């Protein structure tokens, strides 16, 4: 999966100089998507651990998806020339925002689950489709 995301980013970078604005637009939005999903996977893992209802395999899967999302956030951020503190702050802001969405109470986690579960699954599995989505939005 890391190789796929790297290949997608490299393909965007290889476009003509006229596409700089589009590239920046796509990268900014894609990084925002991965930031959101990183927060989602972290909260999911935390909630399942607190509830005691998840097995080790589920927790490992969420952890793997969170790691991949975070690596993507930083890889894309580097391409955008963002410094590490800016990227960390963006992640922290996203995480805090998502906690507020559920009223900082895991009893309300279903609202976050409904909003992000499928989106984040597809972002991880079909990153190239999301790149195309943002490219189309730019036009």
Protein language model features and the residues they cover:
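Short N-proximal segments of mature Sec-exported proteins
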Residues: 26-81
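Compact alpha-helical subdomains of small soluble proteins
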Residues: 61-139
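Cleaved targeting-peptide boundary
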Residues: 18-27
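Sec-dependent N-terminal signal peptides
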Residues: 4-16
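Processing junctions and N-termini across compartments
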Residues: 13, 31-32, 114
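Charged interaction segments
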Residues: 23, 36, 139
């Amino acid at each position: 999966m890391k190789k796929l995301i790297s290949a997608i980013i490299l393909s965007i970078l290889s476009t003509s100089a006229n596409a700089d604005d589009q590239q920046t637009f796509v990268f900014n939005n894609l990084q925002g998507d991965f930031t959101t999903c990183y927060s989602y996977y972290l909260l999911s893992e935390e909630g399942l651990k607190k509830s005691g209802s998840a097995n080790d395999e589920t927790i490992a899967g969420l952890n793997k998806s969170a790691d991949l999302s975070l690596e993507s956030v930083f890889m894309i951020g580097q391409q955008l020339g963002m410094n590490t503190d800016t990227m960390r702050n963006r992640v922290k802001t996203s995480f805090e925002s998502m906690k507020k969405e559920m009223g900082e109470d895991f009893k309300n986690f279903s609202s976050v689950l409904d909003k992000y579960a499928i989106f984040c699954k597809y972002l991880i599995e079909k990153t190239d489709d999301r790149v195309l989505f943002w490219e189309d939005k730019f036009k």
